[in-house]
Amino acid sequence: MEKRLLDFEVGETVELFLLIKSSIKGTASNGKPFLSLVLQDKSGELEAKLWDVKESDEVNYGVQQIVHLIGDIQNYRGRKQLKIRQIRQATPLDGVNASEFMETAPINKEEMADEITQYIFEMKNANLQRITRALLKKYQDDFYDYPAAMRHHHEFVSGLSFHVVSMLRLAKAVSDLYPTVNRDLLYAGVILHDLGKVIELSGPVSTTYTLEGNLIGHISIVVEEVSKIADELSIDDEEVVVLKHVLLSHHGKGEWGSPKPPLVREAEILHQIDLMDASINMMDKVLKHTKPGEFSERVFGLDNRSFYNPTFE
């Protein structure tokens, strides 16, 4: 099987076609310009530096360009980085296209849509069900295409809906174990908690923050959407206030982006399973490329820790 970008070990030489996910110009200590690149294929992404760049390089090696490169995998502060030796733009004769390099969710969109719809049908509270169905219908095309984040966790095509499906499975397990949990409120919170990402982020390819994302953020965006849809549906019961609290507090702490801490049982559960699913996704991503008996590269989103891959099963 042909090796992909993250299959290469430190010290190995890479010769691959890759997609440029991001390209940022900087100035080195010697005053010469360089490009900080994030390069990706279906296995994931790595950072790279292109030194002593010319103006034409900024155009040739911009976002969404496919390139052919030769380089070396190095260790930089506990993480793999690619040192570029040769690079060129791909041409039509190379026969490659962007979709070949984009990581996607391990479940297809149709399966995820069917599963999420089933959870909505299980909801018995009419107000929560109507709000959830209406918002999902409004944004369903983007919801099933967008990543869950720019970096760190579920940052791939359909990552948002895959994150929600995983969390719904966790929510069901928690609700089955603890009968005091309001299953409908928890399900609604899970499905809607990151829906604002479809406005906060630019899309599934070369994702950046939109103006709304930079100035407002996905939490405030989705709470505003809930308020608007509740008005349209003439729902002004307590469910609206409590659902908005669950969404506002799902990051858990003010320093993590939530204006309120969780003050409802289901809000705390949502925060915990969101954190769990994101953390496991980040660990799985690095441990998949870590040999048994070795430590992974550092994971910035998990306090810059390295994780050990045990030798036993």
Curated annotation (Swiss-Prot):
Keywords: Exonuclease, Hydrolase, Nuclease
Keyword Hydrolase: yes
The enzyme's E.C. designation: 3.1.-.-
Family from the record: Belongs to the YhaM family.
Domain of life, per lineage: Bacteria
Name assigned to this protein: 3'-5' exoribonuclease YhaM
Function noted in UniProt: Shows a 3'-5' exoribonuclease activity.
Residue ranges of every copy of the HD domain listed in the record: 163-279
SUPFAM superfamilies (alphabetical): HD-domain/PDEase-like (SSF109604)
First-level EC class: hydrolase
Gene Ontology biological process terms in this record: rRNA 3'-end processing
Signal peptide: none
InterPro entries registered for this protein in UniProt: 3'-5'_exoribonuclease_YhaM, HD/PDEase_dom, HD_domain, NA-bd_OB-fold, YhaM_exoribonuc/phosphodiest
HAMAP family: 3_5_Exoribonuc_YhaM (MF_01427)
Entries under PROSITE patterns matching the protein: HD
Annotated source species: Listeria welshimeri serovar 6b (strain ATCC 35897 / DSM 20650 / CCUG 15529 / CIP 8149 / NCTC 11857 / SLCC 5334 / V8)
Coiled-coil boundaries: none
Annotated GO MF terms: 3'-5'-RNA exonuclease activity
Gene that this sequence comes from: yhaM
Gene3D superfamilies referenced in this protein's UniProt entry, alphabetically: Hypothetical protein af1432 (1.10.3210.10), Nucleic acid-binding proteins (2.40.50.140)
Keyword Plastid applies: no
